Design a protein with these regions (language model features):
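The Walker A/P-loop phosphate-binding site
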Residues: 1-107, 119-128
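Peripheral, non-AAA+ core regions of ATP-driven protein-machinery
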Residues: 18-24, 35, 164, 241-242, ...
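Phosphate-binding/switch region of NTP-binding enzymes
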Residues: 168-284
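Short acidic-hydrophobic, aromatic-tinged amphipathic segments that line or gate anion-handling sites
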Residues: 108-114
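Catalytic P-loop NTPase motifs of RecA-like helicase/translocase cores
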Residues: 93, 151-152, 202-203
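Terminal-proximal interaction/regulatory segments of ATP-powered molecular machines
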Residues: 289-334
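Phosphate-binding/switch loop-helix module in NTP-utilizing enzymes
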Residues: 114-190
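A short alpha->loop->secondary-structure connector
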Residues: 101-108, 159-168, 210-215
């Protein structure tokens, strides 16, 4: 043990420790949806990891940007002194959109990036600047990249300007290099990174398979990869949001290949915190679904009525029971 301590002392690195001294507490950032918290962390009170990369992938119009902004809003609401750096590659985020989502404009920086090299450079500089601050002065911070699939490369731009009709074979390696540099630095700084990305159907696969674009760099760097699908949510004839199907394609924290449904409103309500808990309670046997109504305390109540007044039905005792069910359903080793 003395030898190991001498090695640690000789290296003189703040991030080199004897294993016994490592802080094993996993910290999470609440996403604003209990059921999404459960599928990515194994607890309805968890969320995305506070110092790892989380990838949110899906086809066009599955709500990746809306979903990311909903998580950002909840992060800023939960951390009144926190802030977020939003790397926008699609010029999709403007003041009107942010205001409609209820995001605090004073604590969000939108950074437009065109190339992988530009994102890598700006993100690394931001992390280094953050880590130069004394630990006690560091406020909670989150990074978002929306989206990886739209990033070009400097070579691709040069070839286009020179009218060269050639395919850029460097993009995959540049993505890998960017995440090799960022993954550990973000972990050391306790800064989470949410990356949105597009998916495509794998041609020739024996079973229908989807894969993320941009090569394997993000696939290896991300601790959690969530694939999204969606259907429209209507109030009468008006479309008021999406029902998002979220499936864990990869997770180092919770079980893989688990799927849940989340409700995302288009207005400033964002993610519905309680949507999906009725189905979770049904799995755990807390209540039964009989002809579209749930039996709770001897009464048969429609889901719409319960979700309209969640505090009445999701009491602290019920939430504790639901969390235990979530741990059994989604956590490793259960």
């Amino acid at each position: 043990m003395d030898f190991l301590k001498e090695i640690v002392k000789e290296i003189g690195d703040d991030f080199t420790k004897v294993a016994q001294d490592i802080d094993e507490t996993e910290r999470f950032i609440d996403t604003g949806s209990h059921i999404f918290n459960a599928v990515v962390s194994g607890s309805i009170y968890g969320g995305v990891s506070s110092n790892k990369i989380t990838a949110i992938a899906g086809e066009s119009s599955t709500g990746k940007t809306y979903f990311s902004l909903a998580v950002v809003k909840n992060f800023l609401d939960t951390n009144p002194d926190g802030y977020c750096l939003y790397f926008d590659t699609e010029a999709a985020v403007n003041r009107g959109l942010l205001e409609s989502r209820g995001v605090d404009l004073d604590r969000l920086v939108v950074i437009n990036v065109v190339t992988i090299e530009e994102f890598r450079s700006k993100a690394l500089r931001a992390v280094d600047k953050y880590m130069q601050m004394p630990i006690e002065d560091r406020k909670p911070c989150m990074f978002v990249l929306d989206s990886l699939g739209m990033l070009s490369t400097e070579k691709e731009i040069r070839d286009a300007l020179d009218d060269k009709q050639v395919r850029d074979m460097t993009k995959s390696q540049l993505v890998k290099g960017a995440f090799r540099m960022l993954t550990l630095k973000l972990g050391q700084a306790n800064v989470p990174l949410i990356v949105t990305n597009h998916t495509y159907d794998v041609i020739g696969a024996y079973v229908p398979t989807k894969e993320m674009g941009g090569g394997s760099g993000l696939k290896y760097a991300a601790s959690t990869i969530i694939y999204l699908g969606r259907k429209k949510e209507k109030d009468g004839k008006e479309v008021v949001g999406n029902i998002i199907k979220a499936k864990t394609a990869k997770s180092r924290i919770s079980k893989e290949n688990k799927q849940v449904e989340i409700r995302l409103f288009f207005d400033d309500r964002g993610l519905d915190r309680y949507y999906g808990l009725l189905e979770l309670g049904e799995i755990g046997g807390i209540w039964k679904n009989v002809a579209g109504r749930y039996e709770i305390n001897g009464k048969k109540i429609y889901a719409k009525q319960i979700l309209a007044n969640p505090e009445e039905y999701f009491t602290p005792e019920v939430m504790q029971a639901l969390d235990e069910i979530a741990q059994k359903e989604f956590s490793y080793g259960s």
